[in-house]
């Protein structure tokens, strides 16, 4: 399957930038923050509320309308565990709030290498616990490394009646051993070396790559997991692990042809990203 023409144009433009592997942590974070422009103009929402959970964990809540009964989507940004913040995914969280008619809680979880595993996973569970304490319907979502945290939080809260989980090209297998790691190692946006770097920075030396707290794909029991929708990109290093996890959840992942890792956060320039946003909203709306 050839690349989507808009995706191909994006990749051609990216050749003007330094390769990701040449960037230090600070530059990596700034690059993702600047990439928020690819989402398009941030839409207005009824309210934006900055929060601090448990005295340290920054979060931001988006309200589509002023209604305390609105369901709440806890969203974890991507960035390979080493980048991303409240600003990098601000437009996407606003769009999800409006499209799915729900409040969105964006979580500014701690990043590696300053804070290594299980810091981010602990932050994710804390954020979901806070959300569940609000007495409203709660779901979890995330892209890439954020989908890892969403999946892990869903596993940790089996008995909490989470409405659903939305996993966008999840980074959930630290073994980095699926065929898509070879097939799309280079030339398709973030590649195999970039993903492996994220895992190296995140996992302390000696961590078992199959530890389900780090790699939810290897969780022993998924039978009580909340309903899931897994989105994958055809030309993505992470494609195969996401689709394998979907099969374990008893569903088929929705693969978007001709797309690459990160496409979901580019609705400002990619028609297929706008389609995926609409599909994600439809899934969420069906579970409120």
Feature map (PLM): residue ranges:
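Gly/Ala-rich beta-loop-alpha elbow adjacent to hydrolase catalytic centers
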Residues: 142, 146, 150
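Short beta-strand element of the alpha/beta-hydrolase
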Residues: 69-79
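Serine-hydrolase catalytic core
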Residues: 206-259
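Short beta-strand-to-loop junctions in surface cap/lid or active-site-entrance loops
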Residues: 59-69, 217-222
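Catalytic nucleophile-loop/oxyanion-hole region of alpha/beta-hydrolase
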Residues: 85-86, 92, 100, 105-137, ...
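Catalytic active-site module of serine/aspartate enzymes centered on a nucleophile-bearing elbow/loop
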Residues: 268-288
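A glycine/proline-hinged amphipathic helix-loop "lid/cap" segment
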Residues: 1-64, 288
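Hydrolase active-site cap/lid region
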Residues: 155, 159-207
